[in-house]
């Protein structure tokens, strides 16, 4: 999902992370199995008149001039051997890890986890294709419901799983606008529409066998480049966090490096200079099987946390920048939920909430979900029972989190795998 929330409160390899379309190993088409760039390609088959070889006019057969939609097919059909594109490889930053690159023992250990890595790579390839479709299709005037359906239906079609727990959506699609930093997805009946001057964070989760790829980007439609600087600040801060991350690296050191880059930027609006701040109570996080926030948090400011990253862990490195207070609070109608872990001893307080809980377990397990997904799973008139589960600590709610009104926020995020010998930015693409 998006960042964990803490309510208590370069050249070099950074350049390597920037996309060179001639060198990227994770561009959307792979192994010559490219799909159309636009699954909604328009086919122009209107009637035309041509001359025959004798000069007589011949009328071409008139065909139906309708837009034809190309059906999205399972990602497996493009990779029948089950081997998916690798992400971007990077060496670990600390001197003590230099031996890992050439260690045969470390490479052997890495091969033992190959099924795990392939699950992540499959999810990442789905993610790249889905966001490619989103980036080419989303336009001002679309409703949030339309945008969410576009993204989520694409994930489901590419995953082509016979059960939500085998593969598919990793968490509700985040579509947070302007001062809303994270955890907004539309509930049924939401009338919110994307406007030309909005800045939208698009946070997409894809899982395969519970291995979650968590990656986010920011979209704008302002033709004057109003948001260019805040987007650049957050993108570069995320790249810095990825560069600094690695085995035995202290979490505080990553946050300190991110903050230095992020807060060196500012943007201008109507002649006024707006400093760009890290949203200090939002963090990256490690990812477990079927668990999006698995214990460790990766700060985006210096916070004194001396905890180290460890071999074999998976992290979502994400940063948020804001022109506001640089601090978020919950506000608005909740849409995001997840079952709490370690609460198996707690019992649902009513027969209806017991039925709802069983449906949640069957369809989502410990993966996050939203109200629209419950309705897709057949639930009706469930809000009272859902609120009971929340009050009893069985289900956790994640309402939208916002900075002050009138401010702007941006987000970029990638999932990284800490292999024994190198780190892999598995969700890297030719877009960001």
From Swiss-Prot:
Residues 57-72 have a biased composition (Basic residues). It is found in: Cytoplasm. InterPro entries: Creatinase/aminopeptidase-like, Met_Aminopeptidase_Type2, Pept_M24, Pept_M24_MAP, Pept_M24A_MAP2, Pept_M24A_MAP2_BS, WH-like_DNA-bd_sf, WH_DNA-bd_sf. Residues 1-72 are annotated as: Disordered. A divalent metal cation 2 binds at residues 214, 285, 318, 413. It comes from the Eukaryota. Residues 1-12, 22-33 have a biased composition (Polar residues). Its EC number is 3.4.11.18. One of its GO terms (molecular function) is metalloaminopeptidase activity. Keywords: Aminopeptidase, Cytoplasm, Hydrolase, Metal-binding, Protease. Its main location: cytoplasm. GO terms for cellular component: cytoplasm. Binds 2 divalent metal cations per subunit. Has a high-affinity and a low affinity metal-binding site. The true nature of the physiological cofactor is under debate. The enzyme is active with cobalt, zinc, manganese or divalent iron ions. Most likely, methionine aminopeptidases function as mononuclear Fe(2+)-metalloproteases under physiological conditions, and the catalytically relevant metal-binding site has been assigned to the histidine-containing high-affinity site. Its cofactor is Co(2+); Zn(2+); Mn(2+); Fe(2+). Substrate binds at residues 183, 293. This is Methionine aminopeptidase 2. The lineage of its organism: Eukaryota, Fungi, Dikarya, Ascomycota, Saccharomycotina.
């Amino acid at each position: 999902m998006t960042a964990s929330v803490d309510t208590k409160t370069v050249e070099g390899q950074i350049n390597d992370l920037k996309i060179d379309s001639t060198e990227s190993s994770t561009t959307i088409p792979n192994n010559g199995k490219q799909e159309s760039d636009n699954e909604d390609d328009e086919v122009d088959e209107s009637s035309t008149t041509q001359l025959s070889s004798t000069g007589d006019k011949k009328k071409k057969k008139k065909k139906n001039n309708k837009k034809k939609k190309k059906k999205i097919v399972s990602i497996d059909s493009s990779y029948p051997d089950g081997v998916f594109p690798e992400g971007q490889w990077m060496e670990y930053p600390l001197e003590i890890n230099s031996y890992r690159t050439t260690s045969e023992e470390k490479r052997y250990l890495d091969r033992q986890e190959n099924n795990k890595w392939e699950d992540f790579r499959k999810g990442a390839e789905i993610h790249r294709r889905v966001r490619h479709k989103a980036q080419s299709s989303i336009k001002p005037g679309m409703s949030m419901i339309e945008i969410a359906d576009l993204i989520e239906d694409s994930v489901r079609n590419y995953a082509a799983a016979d059960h939500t727990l085998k593969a598919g959506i990793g968490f509700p699609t985040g579509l947070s606008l302007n001062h809303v930093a994270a955890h907004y997805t539309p509930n049924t009946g939401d009338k919110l529409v994307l406007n030309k001057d909005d800045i939208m964070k698009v946070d997409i989760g894809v899982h395969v066998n519970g291995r979650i790829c968590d990656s986010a980007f920011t979209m704008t439609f302002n033709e004057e480049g109003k948001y260019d600087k805040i987007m650049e600040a957050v993108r570069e801060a995320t790249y810095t966090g990825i560069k600094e991350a690695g085995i035995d690296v202290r979490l505080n050191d990553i946050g300190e490096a991110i903050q230095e880059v992020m807060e060196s930027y500012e943007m201008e609006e109507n002649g006024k200079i707006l400093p760009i701040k890290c949203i200090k109570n939002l963090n990256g996080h490690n990812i477990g099987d079927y668990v999006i926030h698995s214990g460790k948090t990766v700060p985006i400011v210096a916070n004194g946390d001396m905890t180290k990253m460890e071999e074999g862990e998976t992290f979502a490195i994400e940063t948020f920048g804001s022109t506001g207070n640089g601090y978020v609070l919950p506000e608005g109608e909740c849409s995001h939920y997840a079952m709490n872990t370690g609460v198996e001893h707690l019992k649902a307080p009513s027969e209806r909430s017991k039925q709802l809980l069983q449906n949640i377990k069957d369809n989502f397990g410990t993966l996050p979900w939203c109200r629209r997904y419950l309705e897709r799973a057949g639930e009706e008139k469930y809000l009272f029972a859902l609120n009971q589960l929340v009050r009893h600590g069985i289900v956790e709610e994640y309402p939208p989190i916002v900075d002050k009104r009138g401010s702007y926020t941006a987000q970029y995020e990638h999932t990284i795998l800490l292999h024994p010998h190198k780190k892999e930015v598995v969700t890297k693409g030719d877009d960001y």
